């Protein structure tokens, strides 16, 4: 029983990735674990096409400024 419990604890730690890694959207539903030093998620407008804004998403150390941009620091906050 102790072996099973220890195994579950180890698997949980590995699956949770306790390294405080931030995860951001990069395109549509695609997600990326941000590298060290990039502790923000952002979504920023790069222009328009056929009357709709075109956005880029990803990890950042600093965010682009703009009225339609999103800059946040929790997992998957840049949808």
From Swiss-Prot:
Expression sites by tissue: Expressed by the venom gland.
Molecular function per GO: toxin activity
InterPro entries: Snake_3FTx, Snake_toxin-like_sf, Toxin_cobra-type
Keywords: Disulfide bond, Secreted, Signal, Toxin
Disulfide bridge map: 24-41, 34-59, 63-71, 72-77
A Pfam entry, by short name: Toxin_cobra-type
Domain of life: Eukaryota
Subcellular localization, as worded in the UniProt entry: Secreted
Cleaved signal peptide residues: 1-21
Main location: secreted
Note: This toxin has not been detected in venom.
Protein family: Belongs to the three-finger toxin family. Short-chain subfamily.
Protein name from the UniProt record: Three-finger toxin A2
Species per Swiss-Prot/TrEMBL record: Micrurus laticollaris (Balsas coral snake)
